[in-house]
């Protein structure tokens, strides 16, 4: 009887443990995020190209226009890899602009994004200028393939 109880307990532990595997990151879960959602913004930043150089970020949410400042260690190139698309090396300039496009597409109410790289001048983008240059930014986040486009179009 004890053996059956032990086997049943082990089996249930295994089944429950396997059903709690970490959820794969899904970009669609973050569409429509607001700049005030610190956790969601952090999750997005940790998936974008150059995330390995990310130091910290801050959000300006006290009054419009809402903005964010993202600080990176200095880098010259990084891998641009979104989902299962083939990774490609891109310059820091391309990575920052592509990241800004994706952030504007995912975060509804952010109007300005400022990137600070150690030892470099701040690089800033606003929603209006990138929309004029690239059109409807929300179309960029339709699927993983379209999310690679900002990094291909800029180089």
Regions found by a protein language model. Give the residues of each.
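Sec-dependent N-terminal signal peptides of Gram-positive bacterial secreted proteins and lipoproteins
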Residues: 2-21
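Mature extracytoplasmic domains of secretory-pathway proteins
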Residues: 55-121
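Polar/charged, Gly/Pro-rich intrinsically disordered segments
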Residues: 112-155
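Generic preference for well-ordered secondary structure
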Residues: 2, 25-28, 87, 97
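Short secondary-structure boundary micro-motifs
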Residues: 1, 42-44, 96-99
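Intrinsic-disorder-associated interaction segments
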Residues: 23, 34-37, 89, 123, ...
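N-proximal, solvent-exposed amphipathic alpha-helical segments enriched in charged/polar residues
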Residues: 19-80
């Amino acid at each position: 009887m004890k053996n059956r109880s032990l086997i049943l307990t082990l089996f249930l532990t295994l089944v429950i443990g396997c059903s709690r595997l970490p959820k794969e990151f899904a970009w669609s879960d973050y569409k429509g995020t607001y700049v005030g959602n610190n956790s969601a913004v952090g999750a997005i930043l940790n998936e974008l190209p150059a995330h390995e150089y990310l130091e910290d970020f801050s959000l300006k949410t006290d009054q419009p226009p809402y903005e964010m400042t993202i600080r990176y260690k200095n880098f010259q190139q990084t891998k641009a890899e979104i989902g299962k698309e083939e990774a490609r090396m891109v310059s820091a300039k391309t990575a920052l602009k592509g990241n800004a496009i994706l952030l504007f597409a995912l975060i509804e109410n952010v109007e300005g994004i400022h990137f600070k790289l150690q030892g470099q001048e701040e690089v800033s983008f606003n929603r209006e200028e990138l929309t004029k240059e690239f059109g409807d930014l929300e179309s960029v986040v339709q699927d993983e393939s379209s999310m690679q486009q900002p990094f291909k179009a800029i180089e």
